[in-house]
């Protein structure tokens, strides 16, 4: 099984990085291949185009996509859109609080429930 992890990269906090690393370690110990953009995508890209292209390939190749959602991560929103367009199964890694009305938080929670 292959999993792509949507997550903050540039502005991820140390605490977020630790939660993501613990999640990745658990999956990899279980024999699951994890594509982790901070590790597996070359982040030296002056425009971000190649990063988005590499992440798209990782998402296409994944059996399912996991998300560590941080609403401040704009790159995560781009990856989320690609994942949605490809109709991939989505699993949430961290706690997401529902909001009143329409929001990405509510959409992600709904998406995961739909399986």
Regions found by a protein language model. Give the residues of each.
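Conserved catalytic or regulatory cores that recognize and/or transform ribose-phosphate-containing ligands
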Residues: 1-115
């Amino acid at each position: 099984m292959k999993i792509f992890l949507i997550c903050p990269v540039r502005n991820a906090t140390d605490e977020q990085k630790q939660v993501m690393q613990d999640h990745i370690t658990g999956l990899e110990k279980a024999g699951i291949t994890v594509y982790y953009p901070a590790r597996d995508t070359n982040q030296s890209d002056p425009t971000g185009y190649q990063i988005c292209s590499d992440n798209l390939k990782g998402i296409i190749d994944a059996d399912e996509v996991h998300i560590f959602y941080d609403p401040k991560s704009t790159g995560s929103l781009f990856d989320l859109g690609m994942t949605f367009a490809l109709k991939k199964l989505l699993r949430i890694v961290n706690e997401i609080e529902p909001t009143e009305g329409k929001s990405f938080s509510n959409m992600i929670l709904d998406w995961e429930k739909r399986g």
